[in-house]
UniProtKB/Swiss-Prot annotation:
Similarity remark: Belongs to the ATPase epsilon chain family.
Pfam families, A to Z: ATP-synt_DE (PF00401), ATP-synt_DE_N (PF02823)
Top-rank taxon, per record: Bacteria
Alphabetized NCBIfam families for the sequence: ATP_synt_epsi, PRK00571.1-4
This protein's UniProt keywords: ATP synthesis, Cell inner membrane, Cell membrane, CF(1), Hydrogen ion transport, Ion transport, Membrane, Transport
Keyword Ion transport set for record: yes
Species assigned in the record: Shewanella pealeana (strain ATCC 700345 / ANG-SQ1)
Name of the protein described by the UniProt record: ATP synthase epsilon chain
Membrane topology type: Peripheral membrane protein
Gene Ontology CC terms, in alphabetical order: plasma membrane; proton-transporting ATP synthase complex
Claim: Nucleotide-binding is one of the keywords in the record: no
Locations listed in the record: Cell inner membrane
Length: 142
């Protein structure tokens, strides 16, 4: 019996990132973590900065960083429209760690006119990138 799959199309503003049959998609929605499998109810939600994990038709996995965007689930397809998508191997771990430190330092010493929202977004994106890198390292160590 063939494994149940659903068509996934993942695009960013710059590129078409992934198109194919998947058994599962895990992504960070604004209301929490989502696990999407074939037969999932229709859904439209925002995506927050975080990791997206794809389990392909053959059982292999691929991990991405999404900076945010929109997730649409239909009976026969899933669409991810992301602002920025990076494959795990495209993430610069040192740059992400520096961005995290910059945002934390700026927030700690901020005055009344400081833009906390922008700093919080930068911090969330850096933390999400570092989590993707850490997940990949853990999977390699297994």
């Amino acid at each position: 019996m063939a494994a149940m799959t659903v068509q996934l199309d993942m695009v960013s503003a710059e590129n078409h990132i992934f198109s194919g049959r998947v058994a599962q998609l895990q992504v960070s929605g604004t209301e929490g973590e989502l696990g999407i499998m074939p037969g999932h109810a229709a859904l439209l939600t925002s995506i927050k900065p975080g990791m997206a994990r794809i389990v392909k038709q053959n059982g292999s996995e691929e991990v991405f960083y999404l900076s945010g965007g929109i997730l649409e689930v239909q009976p026969s397809s899933i669409s991810v429209l992301a602002d920025v998508v990076l494959r795990a191997d495209e993430i610069d771990e040192q740059a992400a760690a520096e961005a995290k430190l910059r945002a934390e330092t700026a927030m700690a010493g901020a005055g009344a006119d400081f833009n906390y929202a922008a700093a919080a977004v930068e911090l969330a994106q850096a933390i999400a990138q570092l989590r993707v890198v850490e997940t990949i390292k853990k999977n390699i160590a297994r």
